[in-house]
């Protein structure tokens, strides 16, 4: 009877251990293109919250690149966050995000954007990333939030960003 309890505890520990480290390896397996070369991301992954609710996951992490936190726009801004409207042109190389009367047009691998019609320089260009088999378009979180009028706060100690605002429902 005692052996059965020990085996059960060991099995539970092993399952928790495997699950914990398998999710860490997914976060660590992020790659993206930089200057025409494939780069493996080795930095920390960042959590993204919208109105106190986490809107990203281990398979859709926020990344620190060139001093900017880059987030997967579709998952964190469109599907689960503030419900930003979007459109893609030119095979996804031009991305337009709209929210509450504001608009930002981003260009893949370009360090400029049009914010409400005005061309602005941005420090880190949007880029395509892969986490496992999942393809993501990463955008600079602070630039996008500020352009769209979404409150943005960064907490370095918690490796998290917090967005606050009113979710907009669309009749699609």
Residue ranges and their predicted role:
Residues 2-14:
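Bacterial N-terminal signal peptides that target proteins for export
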Residues 4-7, 23-172:
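Primary recognition of N-terminal secretory signal peptides and signal-anchoring hydrophobic helices
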Residues 15-23:
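Hydrophobic core
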């Amino acid at each position: 009877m005692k052996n059965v309890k020990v085996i059960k505890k060991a099995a539970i520990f092993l399952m928790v251990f495997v699950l914990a480290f398998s999710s860490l390896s997914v976060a660590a397996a992020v790659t993206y293109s930089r200057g025409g070369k494939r780069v493996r991301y080795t930095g920390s992954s960042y959590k993204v919250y919208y109105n106190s609710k986490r809107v990203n996951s281990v398979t859709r992490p926020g990344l620190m690149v060139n001093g900017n936190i880059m987030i997967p726009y579709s998952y964190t801004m469109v599907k689960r966050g503030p419900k930003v409207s979007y459109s893609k042109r030119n095979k996804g190389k031009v991305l337009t995000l709209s929210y509450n009367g504001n608009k930002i047009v981003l260009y893949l691998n370009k360090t400029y954007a049009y914010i409400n019609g005005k061309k602005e320089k941005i420090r880190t260009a949007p880029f395509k990333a892969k986490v496992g088999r999942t393809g993501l378009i990463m955008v600079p979180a602070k630039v996008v939030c500020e352009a769209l009028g979404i409150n943005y706060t960064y907490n370095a100690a918690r490796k998290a960003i917090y967005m606050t605002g009113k979710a907009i429902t669309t009749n699609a």
